[in-house]
Design a protein with these regions (language model features):
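Membrane-embedded helix bundles of polyisoprenyl
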Residues: 25, 129-141, 147-200
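Start-transfer (signal-anchor) and selected internal transmembrane alpha helices
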Residues: 1-37
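A broad structural signal for alpha-helix termini and local helix breaks/kinks
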Residues: 111, 142-143
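Membrane-interface helix-boundary signature
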Residues: 17, 113-120, 181, 197
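Intrinsic-disorder/low-complexity, polar/charged segments
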Residues: 13, 48-49, 102, 145, ...
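Coil-to-alpha-helix initiation sites in intrinsically disordered, low-complexity, charged segments
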Residues: 9, 17, 75, 82, ...
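Membrane-interface coil-to-helix junctions
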Residues: 29-132, 154-176
Length: 200
């Protein structure tokens, strides 16, 4: 067969359902958040820290890292100190816990600052999709039927802990990325593929 045609599956070979799992988790998350997103006019207002911190932190740091908010003639090093945070604070100290370690935050920098309040739901959908995909990669090694890995991945992604802690948006980064670390550890220990795990 040519490179453009896949070879037929051998008897007993597992079918990879990674993208199915990612899509299923993204669709499920979209169905969960979409009614609230529409009722709130494109915003997702949840509770507590999500409204007062998470949305504003994403929006503020998006503009801050792009150079917004500096006084005219400012000669200092940009993007390191914020007078708008607390009584003035180094941004690495103030935002590393919430944002700087999050690949989802860095992805959000591709969009304009004013879009960030509207992007919170798409970012949440992405986090749940990534969590489901990672859980599938980890679980598929331990099941005979890949459908059980899909089911386990969906149960992991939409566990009570993950859904409850939506208002701590940065907690979901751990839910999304942890299964990839587990899968990489299994690859290193079981399959002796040591290339990926050191990066975790």
């Amino acid at each position: 067969m040519t490179a453009f045609h896949s070879s037929p599956r051998m008897l007993g070979q597992k079918q990879d359902k990674f993208w199915l799992t990612v899509g299923l988790c993204a669709l499920t998350a979209a169905l969960i958040f979409l009614p609230f997103y529409l009722l709130d006019g494109g915003f997702f207002h949840y509770a507590g820290d999500f409204n007062s911190q998470q949305i504003s932190f994403y929006r503020y740091m998006n503009g801050f890292l792009k150079g917004a908010g500096y006084p005219a003639g400012y000669e200092g090093v940009k993007n390191t100190f914020s007078w708008a945070t607390d009584l003035g604070s180094g941004t690495m100290n103030a935002y590393s816990f919430y944002l700087y370690g999050s690949p989802f935050f860095w992805f959000s920098l591709l969009f304009p600052q004013n879009w960030l309040p509207y992007l919170m739901v798409p970012l949440l959908v992405l986090k749940f999709a990534v969590a489901g995909g990672g859980a599938y990669l980890y679980l598929r090694r331990y099941v005979k039927d890949p459908n059980f890995a899909v089911l386990g991945a969906a149960l992991y992604a939409f566990s009570g802990w993950g859904l409850y802690n939506i208002f701590f948006n940065h907690f979901l980064d751990v839910v999304a990325l942890f299964p990839y670390m587990l899968a990489a550890l299994d690859d290193a220990v079981i399959d002796d593929k040591k290339g990926v795990f050191p990066f975790w």
